[in-house]
Amino acid sequence: MKKIKFIVASIAVCMGITAQAQETKSAEPKGKAIVQTFGNFNADFSKDGDSHGFELERAYLGYEYKLDGGLSVKTVMDIGKSSDVSDLQRIAYVKNALVQWKQGKWTVNGGMISTTQFNFQEKFWGYRYVLKSFQDLYKFGSSADLGISAAYKATDWLSADAIIVNGEGYKKVQKGTGLCYGLGATLTPVKGLQVRLYGGLNQGATADANTLNTAAFVGYKADAFSLGAEYNYMDKAGSKQSGYSAYATVNVADNTNLYARWDEVFAGNTVSDPLRPSGSSPLKRDSAAAIVGAQFKVGKYIKVAPNVRMQMDRKAGNNTYEGYVSWYFGL
């Protein structure tokens, strides 16, 4: 009997040690490297165009580390083009340097964080390495900034978020005369259908120098395809700009997608502007763009996306046609 009790006690102790070891292992911090590179080969097929060549658009290098208690830290460097220097040069910026706390229905971010103005639309579009999303491409706002954000998932079909940042973007982190405030809501009324609403105010030195942003998005995603459309409006100190973007993806095979997108931009000005004088209509067609292409996944880390682009300048009446082979490498 004593031997049996000893054996049972030994097994119980071993099970306790094993369970404790498993619990300790699951609670151990986990980290991962962030490595992403965007590039392409492009050629201009326009009437007077003769440019062609390889281009390294952007590289992201960083690290993310998950701690216990729902905490994680993330730092990412963005090496890419800048309007401050020659197109042949590349500059490194801190794109993310943040702490995230995630617990239950709450997610809170602080530091150099991703903004909420068009992050949802960019993920739905899904081809950031090929072409920026509408608001990013036409300078409606910045994709990252210094500040804090909080999101709350009220139900399975409704979540809300708020953000307060400097309003200068991640390339100009100094504080200005005001802050940028944003409120958003995301709805999923039925499976696959997604609706996103956003409104933001970027304070200027005076009330008439403020920038107002509003955005609405509707998208549907299924296993075989996805469809999305967004409308965006910006009033920057009286200079108004708006536009919409519609895009679609069809999954034709496990590693092959077809995609297309159409952008339309409208611009106007309430003040004197010789290029866009005020008329009966405050917003006039300014430009449009179209892109059609395919994406091929080569293994786990590489994507290749040949595509054709057309840009239409309504003001000048010129069209440009370009061919691209975009590529992505990421861990």
Residue ranges and their predicted role:
Residues 26-29, 34, 38-50, 85-89, ...:
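Outer-membrane beta-barrel pore domains
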Residues 23-167, 177-179, 186-193, 247, ...:
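Outer membrane beta-barrel
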Residues 169-173, 183-184, 198-199, 203-206:
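Short helix-to-loop capping/linker segments positioned immediately adjacent to catalytic or ligand/cofactor-binding
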Residues 1-26:
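Cleavable N-terminal export/targeting peptides
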Residues 115, 171, 297:
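Short, electropositive, low-hydrophobicity segments enriched in small/polar residues
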Residues 142, 173-180, 206-213, 217:
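Short, contiguous, pocket-lining structural segments
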